[in-house]
């Protein structure tokens, strides 16, 4: 009898599951229902809380939810979609590759797709800039590439400590988290990350204080308590840290300090690179020559996972397989990444467009700040990586929520989430850009 009841319970559950599956397959569960996400997905989910609709389609700078409502995207996958959603050329290249039975997963084996990506990158990006780097393909996330960069720096120099900066953000895995400044993320590690000394970023002590002088002094002083590190890691524009843009002179000073102390310079260009700050590399305007460059996010062109290191040849001290990962050979991402290089980077047109569009956005943000002088709003950033500092996280949250209600997707950043971060696709047309800025302007006015 007991077994019969168990059988009946099993059959009842099976019947319920079949009914639910049929409902899912018949689309009855759709129309922007978030029930599945709220009931099945972990509490760690984030963006679906900020933007509580089900996004279904996208093209360029426009998103559509399941009900067909349109949203202007000034988030771009947090910097992944510099060229917008679903570029037709990228999709065509990817589709042709898939139909040809091209290798999709290949570990780090030699494939035509990887060869073409490296050759395109070398010919289009590196050689015209007088740069010589070797490629290291890491796991699919930027954090994994940061891990590889830190490991390589320690292996190449024989030193162990790393210098990072206040408000820096480099990823969520333990090594990357150790060089990340934000306490909210660091606390989630469960133990205090070690081996990192944090120094004040440019402007941290105000515009009149050159924090690089402090760094130079403590490194030169054997009694400062700060060891000469294996590497200094930095973002030239801090994204998650609040759109803090370092001055050219400060960056050049950091590079001089690295050279004088035999320290490797790692530039994390995961978010600021691939044209977001103007040039392909965000450090070009300062004339830097980093020892290691970390790239991810927009490097694949259309949102496919890909990350890599660019390292100077003399630093290639790895033994075979010493840093590996199952998904370090995303060949479809190589295909779309090469397509992006061919389409956008064989001349300076996109860089010029980014700088001009950035000026338009910055001027509009200054108008917003001027209109609301009582709240001491301010504008920050470079290129099309810009932010509106609202002073408090609560005000920024109200503005972002109102903007979403009006059809604009934009997020917050900074230590207190007090900065509204604008990352529209670099290819956004003027009409869409102005519509988005109009919504933001109205949302600020309605929230103050």
Curated annotation (Swiss-Prot):
EC code: 2.6.1.-
Pfam family, one: Aminotran_3
Entry's Gene Ontology BP terms: ectoine biosynthetic process
Gene3D superfamilies with a match to the protein in the record: Aspartate Aminotransferase, domain 1, Type I PLP-dependent aspartate aminotransferase-like (Major domain)
Entry-linked InterPro entries: Aminotrans_3, Aminotrans_3_PPA_site, Dat, Ectoine_EctB, PyrdxlP-dep_Trfase, PyrdxlP-dep_Trfase_major, PyrdxlP-dep_Trfase_small
Top-level taxon of the source organism: Bacteria
Cofactor(s) required for function per UniProt: pyridoxal 5'-phosphate
Keywords: Aminotransferase, Plasmid, Pyridoxal phosphate, Transferase
Primary enzyme class: transferase
Modified residues (N6-(pyridoxal phosphate)lysine): 297
Disulfide bonds: none
PROSITE patterns membership: AA_TRANSFER_CLASS_3 (PS00600)
GO molecular function: diaminobutyrate-pyruvate transaminase activity; pyridoxal phosphate binding
CDD domains: OAT_like
Matching PANTHER family: DIAMINOBUTYRATE--2-OXOGLUTARATE AMINOTRANSFERASE (PTHR43552), DIAMINOBUTYRATE--2-OXOGLUTARATE TRANSAMINASE (PTHR43552:SF2)
Family: Belongs to the class-III pyridoxal-phosphate-dependent aminotransferase family.
Name of protein: Uncharacterized aminotransferase y4qG
Organism whose genome encodes this protein: Sinorhizobium fredii (strain NBRC 101917 / NGR234)
